[in-house]
Amino acid sequence: IEDFKWTEGCIWTLVLLTELGYKIFIVTNQSGVARGYYTEADVQKLHAYIAGEAEKFGAKIEKFYYCPHLKDGSVPEYAIDCDCRKPKPGMILKAFAEYDLAKDECFLIGDGKRDVEAAQAAGIKGYLYQGGSLLEFTKNILKG
């Protein structure tokens, strides 16, 4: 947790999307679990911290989805070729299975090509964030 840093404008982006009625989901590859760098409990602790900090500002993160797998990982139970590791759409599709979401109203913002590919594979819009204010980036997406 001590190494975690918020992306510029991230908190206010979460607040804006919450105020506009969006359900916010985080989908993240966590190959460090498969590599033995940290545990799933560590990932869950970080996610609880992030959600708690966001809530202090009035933002609500609906759910975190994470993939602990890596085909070439050093921890055997996580060293698998799964359907959830981005660019595969498994985590996004799981959110659609668990929540009543309209694909045409959903979008994903990610900082890597795999994020956008996962969004496209799931049938939603994906946007590549490459730095600067995430809030301004998101406002431009919402403007259409």
Name each region found by the language model.
Residues 1, 33-34, 79:
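Short coil/turn segments at secondary-structure junctions
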Residues 1-12:
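Basic, amphipathic juxtamembrane/active-site segments
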Residues 10-47, 61-70, 119:
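Substrate-recognition element of Asp-dependent hydrolases with the DxDx(T/V) motif
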Residues 40-63, 72-108, 112-144:
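Asp-based, Mg2+/Mn2+-dependent phosphohydrolase catalytic module
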